[in-house]
From Swiss-Prot:
Residues 30-667 are extracellular. The modification Phosphotyrosine is found at Y734. Highly expressed in mitotic cells with low expression during interphase. Detected at highest levels in skeletal muscle and colon with lower levels in kidney, small intestine, placenta and lung. Up-regulated in a number of human tumor cell lines, as well as in colorectal cancer, breast carcinoma and lung cancer. Also expressed in cells with phenotypes reminiscent of mesenchymal stem cells and neural stem cells. It comes from Homo sapiens. Residues 1-29 form the signal peptide. This is CUB domain-containing protein 1. SUPFAM superfamilies: Spermadhesin, CUB domain. It comes from the Eukaryota. May be involved in cell adhesion and cell matrix association. May play a role in the regulation of anchorage versus migration or proliferation versus differentiation via its phosphorylation. May be a novel marker for leukemia diagnosis and for immature hematopoietic stem cell subsets. Belongs to the tetraspanin web involved in tumor progression and metastasis. Residues 776-836 are annotated as: Disordered. The gene is CDCP1.
Length: 836
């Protein structure tokens, strides 16, 4: 029995020497003993509240508590009232190190007590080191080094390092870090506070860092980041995302192999309100003759740097009333130099105006793998992932990128007119400059914003090659397209996407538009010769858009209304001027039976008008069915005018035009031949009769006149042949013969259409006569559908006075006042000239 008691005593002594002991989990008993003057405090407290129904307590001598504090020189034995205390409690072990009253314990830092002797709770080891301002402290981290994370981020293994510094009595957060990074050392002065957070299941039993003594660093801190190969690091200013301490200095030292290149890009930053000094970043770059190089935070940062370099952030004296905050988050990317980095490209924009060129990364899915960055460098030094070049200068750029297909270009140019008297009839070419085409980066968009004075001028686009409108039935298969849309902020109007190789000869638009050349394949470089638009400023017209279409006899033309996916905007009118060659017939086909539009206010109309005869059909789109396929022998208009539709019932129409050769009916030819033969025989018979009568007259002797003075020599009056008076009939009114009936062959245009000039009606000039679209009915009217209604031309001249014997005018439906028609045949008068 004595031997047994001796063994128990030895075992208990061993537990005390270790400082803490844990009994088997079944007993759930723990003992923690802290040596005297160790400056260690252990605190067990409730962690994040859980939804567990049954609470858990710390049990000491049958007392149930929720928090336990153990100080130096104390020994406590305790248990938990539950089987899973890690779900309820956390443990903090804090060691205070005072370097101001005695020597500092420099070297590797140990975990005390050992994690193997502590309860299986989430653990936080804290080292709080206080030192003089003149003493620098350096935290050295063993491999794997640290990686800084931002707010809301977490470490994959749950192990985090929280590091803080001190400015007088104020604690400053340097940052939160995970394992597997590039941060190897952090230097501070006036003290440091290091917290290591370990999850309850993690087996780690070493701190992973050491403390060294250094001279004063004369700044808040210095963070060293070491790159052994290609990689990237994201770093943040102190207190991020809150404000950087006022008038402080923080430095990052980067160790980069000489054969690699480093580039810096700012991901996020804010500036405070400075009273004195200026917030800035300073670089110490190897080989630079101007070290340190000073940049503003909004400047493009250096890139393509070889070897080690330093980056410092300098604050300022802030405004006491409105200080604002200074903060910075940036990324350093290290990679091998690329061949393109040694090649300089010249982009000459000195002759351009109101133009900007942006080179930027394509949108890609994020990957956890390291991907070498793509940078574009200005003058080989200022590098960033985005670079914007402006007009008026000549620029030299190079690329630091392993794959240039990861970049693309977007260009914007504004062509505006402020004085309509100067701009009218002026033309501008919309072409991509050759300097841009020669760059090794693919062009994505080239946008021209075309601006005109409101209600003064309109625009016309004429392509180098006729355009095809992109539709689902006939998509564009070229390497680029033109996207035409309104440039008025309050107007949602997209005319469509167009590519070369179609039948659209020109596009007229009423007001400001944006024309965007968008490429879809690298082959655009080979097809660049096909691109080219000419824009001209023309007199103002009220149509939102007019498309001039000259269909090809070999293919079907598909056309659709603007805003196909959203519907034609309210109260918008668009027209298509469709030319039909003389020897062709056009078939107009709509692809659905009804338009589907439901008008909230007003009416939606479609007008199909023959340009030669002015015959037109008017359809109410919100009531009528769309017309069935119709054939047109001459050029014609299609006009579509929208109402204010209800939500979800928008107006969108798709139609096609197909040309076929014109054929003549054999029956018509036979009838014409027979009729011609009859007329010829009748003419021959009439000629024979006239010849015979003439011969009879020549056989008679000369006539002898005898004077008789009892005979009245006055010519007798013409007896009345009309029972009505002059006022009762239109005998004095002659119908005017239309010019097109007499001079029709002189009024035909190149496409065979008749151009009928308008008379006695003033309209603003809208181009060549006959190119004006039909005017839609009043939007709020309820006019029924009119079929083939020939337009009556207005009178050609003012009405004549009633005293004139003859009047040339159009038929008048009004009453004609009665006048005497008895006029002596030998006393006739010449008609008077019409009054001007």
């Amino acid at each position: 029995m004595a031997g047994l008691n001796c063994g128990v005593s030895i075992a208990l002594l061993g537990v005390l020497l270790l400082g803490a002991a844990r009994l088997p989990r079944g007993a759930e008993a723990f003992e923690i003993a802290l040596p005297r003057e160790s400056n260690i405090t252990v605190l067990i407290k409730l962690g994040t509240p859980t939804l567990l129904a049954k609470p858990c307590y710390i049990v000491i001598s049958k007392r149930h508590i929720t928090m336990l504090s153990i100080k130096s020189g104390e020994r406590i034995v305790f248990t938990f009232s539950c089987q899973s205390p890690e779900n309820h409690f956390v443990i903090e072990i804090q060691k205070n190190i005072d370097c101001m009253s005695g020597p500092c314990p420099f070297g590797e830092v140990q975990l005390q007590p050992s994690t193997s002797l502590l309860p299986t709770l989430n653990r936080t080891f804290i080292w709080d080191v206080k030192a003089h301002k003149s003493i620098g402290l350096e935290l050295q981290f063993s491999i794997p080094r640290l990686r800084q994370i931002g707010p809301g981020e977490s470490c994959p293994d749950g192990v985090t390092h929280s590091i803080s510094g001190r400015i007088d009595a104020t604690v400053v957060r340097i940052g939160t870090f995970c394992s597997n990074g590039t941060v190897s050392r952090i230097k501070m002065q006036e003290g440091v506070k290091m917290a290591l957070h370990l999850p309850w299941f993690h087996p780690r039993n070493v701190s992973g860092f050491s403390i060294a003594n250094r001279s004063s660093i004369k700044r808040l801190c210095i963070i060293e980041s070491v790159f052994e190969g290609e990689g990237s690091a994201t770093l943040m200013s102190a207190n991020y995302p809150e404000g950087f301490p006022e008038d402080e200095l923080m430095t990052w030292q980067f160790v980069v192999p000489a054969h690699l290149r480093a580039s810096v890009s700012f991901l996020n930053f804010n500036l405070s309100n400075c009273e004195r000094k200026e917030e800035r970043v300073e670089y110490y770059i190897p080989g630079s003759t101007t070290n340190p190089e000073v940049f503003k935070l909004e400047d493009k940062q250096p890139g393509n740097m070889a070897g080690n370099f330093n980056l410092s952030l300098q604050g300022c004296d802030q405004d006491a009333q409105s200080p604002g905050i200074l903060r910075l988050q940036f990324q350093v990317l290290v990679q091998h130099p690329q061949n393109e980095s040694n090649k300089i490209y010249v982009v000459d924009l000195s002759n351009e105006r109101a133009m900007s060129l942006t080179i930027e990364p394509r949108p890609v899915k994020q990957s956890r793998k390291f991907v070498p960055g793509c940078f574009v460098c200005l003058e080989s030094r200022t590098c960033s992932s985005n670079l914007t070049l402006t007009s008026g200068s000549k620029h030299k750029i190079s690329f630091l990128c392993d794959d240039l297909t990861r970049l693309w270009m977007n260009v914007e140019k504004t062509i505006s007119c402020t004085d309509h008297r100067y701009c009218q009839r002026k033309s501008y070419s919309l072409q991509v400059p050759s300097d841009i085409l020669h760059l090794p980066v693919e062009l994505h968009d080239f946008s021209w914003k075309l601006l005109v004075p409101k209600d003064r001028l309109s625009l016309v686009l004429v392509p180098a090659q006729k355009l095809q409108q992109h539709t689902h039935e006939k998509p564009c298969n070229t390497s680029f397209s033109y996207l035409v849309a309104s440039a008025i902020p309050s107007q949602d109007l997209y005319f469509g996407s167009f590519c070369p190789g179609g039948s659209i000869k020109q596009i007229q638009v009423k007001q400001n538009i944006s024309v965007t050349l968008r490429t879809f394949a690298p082959s655009f470089q080979q097809e660049a010769s096909r691109q080219g638009l000419t824009v001209s400023f023309i007199p103002y017209f009220k149509e939102e858009g007019v498309f001039t279409v000259t269909p090809d006899t070999k293919s079907k033309v598909y056309l659709r209304t603007p805003n196909w996916d959203r519907g034609l905007p309210s109260l918008t009118s668009v027209s298509w001027n469709i030319s039909v060659p003389r020897d062709q017939v056009a078939c107009l086909t709509f692809f659905k039976e009804r338009s589907g539009v439901v008008c909230q206010t007003g009416r939606a109309f479609m007008i199909i008008q023959e340009q030669r005869t002015r015959a037109e059909e008017i359809f109410s789109l919100d009531e009528d069915v769309l017309p069935k396929p119709s054939f047109h022998h001459h050029s014609f208009w299609v006009n579509i005018s929208n109402c204010s539709p209800t939500s979800g019932k928008q107006l969108d129409l798709l139609f096609s035009v197909t040309l076929t050769p014109r054929t003549v009916d054999l029956t018509v030819i036979l009838i014409a031949a027979v009729g011609g033969g009859v007329l010829l025989l009748s003419a021959l018979g009439l000629i024979i009769c006239c010849v015979k009568k003439k011969k009879k007259k020549t056989n008679k002797g000369p006539a002898v006149g005898i004077y008789n003075d009892n005979i009245n020599t006055e010519m007798p009056r013409q007896p009345k042949k009309f029972q009505k008076g002059r006022k009762d009939n239109d005998s004095h009114v002659y119908a005017v013969i239309e010019d097109t009936m007499v001079y029709g062959h002189l009024l035909q245009d190149s496409s065979g259409s008749f151009l009928q000039p308008e008379v006695d009606t003033y309209r603003p000039f809208q181009g060549t006569m006959g190119v004006c679209p039909p005017s839609p009915p009043t939007i709020c009217s309820r006019a029924p559908t009119a079929k083939l209604a020939t337009e009556e031309p207005p009178p050609r001249s003012p009405p004549e006075s009633e005293s004139e014997p003859y009047t040339f005018s159009h038929p008048n439906n009004g009453d004609v006042s009665s006048k005497d028609t008895d006029i002596p045949l030998l006393n006739t008068q010449e008609p008077m000239e019409p009054a001007e």
